[in-house]
Amino acid sequence: MKRTYQPKKRQRKKEHGFRKRMKTKAGRNILRNRRRKGRKTLSA
């Protein structure tokens, strides 16, 4: 059986990237919360 995580740089950026987060209200909320918490990386 193969593992579930098969990393791909492009796919990761497309799904969890900054621009994708900025597109939706919910995504902007995620970024806002991560900024408030002081996360070093906001998104993939």
Swiss-Prot record:
GO terms for molecular function: structural constituent of ribosome. The keyword Protein biosynthesis does not apply. Residues 1-44 are annotated as: Disordered. The keyword Ribonucleoprotein applies. Keywords: Ribonucleoprotein, Ribosomal protein. Signal peptide: none annotated. GO terms for biological process: translation. GO terms for cellular component: ribonucleoprotein complex; ribosome. InterPro entries: Ribosomal_bL34 (IPR000271), Ribosomal_bL34_CS (IPR020939). Belongs to the bacterial ribosomal protein bL34 family. This is Large ribosomal subunit protein bL34. It comes from Natranaerobius thermophilus (strain ATCC BAA-1301 / DSM 18059 / JW/NM-WN-LF). The gene is rpmH.
